[in-house]
């Protein structure tokens, strides 16, 4: 497993990380299979695990804590503070007081540490962000206090979908160590401004949603309708589903012999050296093995 580094993060992490959103609270989650998948990831060299308090109200953090206690390998831990108003994404008019007042930042850092059973997190992230808050000294002081007290090693921001520009001001403050952003074959906008700035500032890039919520993993068809309560029902509405399937069918025609669509999608993200790690969700052992194999296959041929 390749290890990549970013100056501000201060430690190497696996190029293939593990996104833990779908591990708690989903109706079709097999908890025993989840544990096996996590163990398989560690055995394969995955060292970076990204969770959040909002993933099952701390349950996903608990799963990560148990994983850490099962293994002697040094695993890099990342979690996220939920916005106080519990609104995703952060509305453009949202005030810092509504989302991340200082006492809320500390409270949920401590709650995450309790769920994990750890004295310190390698990386804590704001689960939503608006750059209107960038120069507000209240969150800056709160983060400095957490670092001073040894509760976190680094701080990051998780950017709203389709808004890779809505974090540039925060990065320019020099206080941000990592940025999490949607980046995949269909959404390459972070390449324009975000990635170059992160490289300049030494900020780690955590790429999420590499499979476009499943469409690039073969989970979408022209007639599939997701059940009520599944966010993909709204995301893949009739119009978006048709347009996405058109693009997928064009991609499939250009795939080299023997290469699957999910392999191409993951290798596309990993081929960009600006990306420090990519965090697909993996609830099954077969998914872990497939993604590890894609990582080990190396960068895509530039001709693609």
List PLM regions with ranges.
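Structural motif corresponding to the early beta-alpha repeats
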Residues: 70-100
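Conserved, mostly hydrophobic/aromatic
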Residues: 6, 18, 34, 49, ...
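Active-site mouth loops of central-metabolism enzymes
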Residues: 21-32, 91-106, 129-132
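Beta/alpha (TIM)-barrel catalytic core signal, keyed to glycine-rich beta->alpha loops juxtaposed to Asp/Glu
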Residues: 57, 128-304
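N-terminal binding-site loop/beta-alpha segment at the start of enzyme catalytic domains
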Residues: 1-76
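Alpha-helical scaffolding within the catalytic cores
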Residues: 1-5, 108-110, 164-165, 190
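Active-site groove signature of glycoside hydrolases
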Residues: 113-132
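Short, acidic/polar
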Residues: 28-41, 99-116, 161-170
């Amino acid at each position: 497993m390749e290890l990549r580094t970013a100056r501000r993060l201060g430690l190497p992490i696996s190029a293939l990380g593990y996104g833990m959103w779908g591990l708690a609270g989903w109706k079709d989650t097999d908890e025993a299979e989840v544990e096996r998948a996590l163990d398989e990831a560690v055995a394969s060299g995955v060292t970076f695990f990204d969770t959040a308090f909002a993933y099952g109200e701390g349950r996903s953090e608990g799963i990560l804590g148990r994983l850490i206690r099962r293994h002697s390998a040094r695993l890099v831990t990342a979690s996220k503070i939920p916005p106080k108003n519990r609104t995703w994404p952060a509305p453009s008019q949202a005030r810092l007081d509504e989302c991340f007042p200082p006492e809320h930042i500390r409270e949920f850092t401590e709650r995450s540490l309790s769920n994990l059973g750890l004295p310190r997190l390698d990386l804590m992230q704001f689960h939503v962000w608006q750059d209107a808050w960038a120069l507000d000294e209240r969150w800056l002081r709160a983060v400095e206090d957490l670092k001073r007290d040894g509760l976190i090693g680094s701080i990051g921001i998780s950017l709203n979908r389709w808004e890779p520009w809505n974090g540039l001001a925060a990065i320019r403050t020099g206080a941000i160590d990592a940025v999490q952003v949607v980046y995949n074959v269909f959404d390459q906008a972070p390449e324009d401004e975000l990635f170059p700035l992160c490289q300049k500032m030494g900020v780690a890039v955590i790429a999420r949603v590499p499979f476009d919520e499943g469409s690039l993993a073969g989970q979408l068809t022209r007639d599939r309708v997701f059940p009520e309560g599944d966010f993909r029902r709204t995301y893949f509405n009739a119009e978006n589903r048709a347009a996405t399937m058109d693009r997928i069918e064009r991609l499939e025609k250009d795939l080299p012999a023997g290469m699957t669509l999910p392999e191409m999608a993951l290798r596309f993200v990993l081929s960009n050296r600006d990306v420090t790690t990519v965090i697909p969700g993996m609830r099954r052992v077969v998914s872990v093995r497939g993604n590890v194999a894609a990582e080990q296959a190396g960068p895509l041929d530039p001709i693609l």
